[in-house]
């Protein structure tokens, strides 16, 4: 079992340390998303170390499809495969099965679906998801869950929560078996359960109570940031937070904007991930301490300033807005790389500043100063 140490609190906000076999994670933390064991935009693991990334997130579904989890197992696991010596979290594949896969059919055993790449029929259930993640040898494995569309009818959401709980029990049992095998690469692989229930607070609370009884290594809130208003997301967090174990990390999946993250930390969340910093960067949409910047706007065509004068990332230390904008306009790979590096640097710096504010007992002031500013347009 991993150890989560709660160092300080301010209101519901938490400052902690999460000790794993691949190193200690300082929380709150943002996990950089490398879907296929790489971040799009030409960003290497060397870059990730330089910008302060603590945890990398990779995608079980995509790695199972290509290059195959058995190949990664034969290469010594995901850490050796892409030369990363810090924690890696792999999602269960559930979200992709329910959002990308074609012709899916859900049963109590799992999900039959067609690959979005070649149409090949695939079956994935709790045991298969755990086996794939064990082959990947990630630090943290996510339980296999049903990702229900939002909005969903109450009755369906309730039945789905019950099925997801039964799947979680099977995940826990299968992980215990896999971690005991002599051929398993990471015998200390951790398991996080996922809270579901759409935006129905009674379902969310009941589900969190039930999964908390299983004494897992961490607890995620899933099925949010899928189109519902931000206030509904915050309401769900507030509803389930009292029932999430205090001595375990809380992870809000797929979130989000800097403002979303600040709001969620304020409500007691420790872990975050999102493709937004890299995806937005590839289109010239950048995050700064002054607010959001669209680098492709005409006003930046002759701007000699860096993306942000208060930023220490490689792009801001060396290049102007005008130059990076030019690179994006001519589809030069360097432009996308510099923008991705900037956004990832900003997200990791945001988390470092949040931790510093919690350490110093001034998070409330930090929150008030930046919660609206980060959403403004520069």
Regions from the PLM with identified roles:
Residues 162-165, 174, 178, 186, ...:
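Glycine-rich phosphate/ribose-binding loops and adjacent secondary-structure elements
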Residues 128, 132, 159-170, 206, ...:
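A non-catalytic, amphipathic alpha-helix used as a structural packing/dimerization or gating element
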Residues 174-184, 248, 354-366:
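Surface-exposed helix-capping loop/turn segments at secondary-structure junctions
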Residues 1-17, 25-34, 41-42, 145-151, ...:
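C-terminal extensions of enzymes
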Residues 23, 56, 91, 133, ...:
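Conserved, mostly hydrophobic/aromatic
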Residues 23, 164-171, 211, 240, ...:
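Hydrophobic alpha-helical packing residues
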Residues 1-185, 298-301:
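Non-catalytic, usually N-terminal nucleic-acid engagement modules in DNA/RNA processing proteins
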């Amino acid at each position: 079992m991993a150890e989560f140490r709660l160092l300080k609190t301010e209101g519901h906000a938490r400052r902690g340390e999460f000790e794993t076999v691949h190193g200690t994670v300082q929380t709150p933390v943002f996990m950089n998303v490398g879907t296929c064991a790489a971040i799009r935009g030409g960003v290497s693991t060397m870059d990730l170390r330089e910008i302060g990334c603590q945890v990398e997130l990779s995608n079980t579904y995509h790695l199972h499809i290509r290059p195959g989890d058995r190949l990664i197992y034969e290469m010594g696991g995901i850490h050796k495969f892409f030369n990363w010596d810090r924690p890696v979290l792999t999602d269960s594949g559930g979200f992709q099965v329910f959002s990308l896969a074609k012709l899916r059919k859900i049963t109590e055993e799992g999900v039959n679906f067609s690959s979005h790449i070649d149409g090949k029929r695939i079956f994935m259930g709790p045991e298969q998801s755990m086996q794939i993640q064990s082959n990947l040898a990630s630090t943290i494995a996510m339980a296999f869950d049903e990702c229900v569309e939002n909005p969903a009818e109450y009755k369906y959401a309730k039945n789905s929560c019950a099925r997801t709980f039964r799947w979680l029990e099977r995940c826990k049992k299968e992980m215990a078996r896999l971690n005991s095998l002599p051929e398993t690469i990471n015998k200390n692989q951790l398991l996080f359960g996922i809270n579901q229930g759409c935006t129905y607070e009674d379902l969310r609370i009941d589900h969190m109570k039930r999964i908390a009884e299983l004494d897992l290594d961490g607890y995620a809130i899933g099925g949010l940031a899928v189109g519902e208003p931000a206030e509904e997301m915050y309401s769900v967090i507030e509803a389930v937070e009292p029932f999430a174990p205090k001595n375990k990390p809380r992870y809000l999946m797929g979130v989000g904007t800097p403002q979303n993250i600040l709001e969620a930390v304020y409500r007691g969340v420790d872990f975050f991930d999102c493709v937004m910093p890299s995806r937005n960067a590839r289109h010239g949409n950048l995050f700064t301490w002054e607010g959001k910047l669209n680098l492709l706007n005409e006003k930046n065509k002759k701007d000699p300033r860096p993306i942000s004068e208060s930023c220490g990332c490689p792009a801001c230390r060396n290049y102007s807005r005008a130059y990076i904008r030019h690179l994006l306009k001519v589809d030069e790979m360097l432009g996308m790389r510099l923008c991705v590096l900037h956004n990832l640097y900003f997200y990791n710096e945001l988390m470092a500043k949040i931790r510093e504010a919690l350490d110093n007992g001034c998070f409330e002031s930090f929150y008030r100063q930046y919660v609206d500013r980060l959403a403004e347009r520069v």
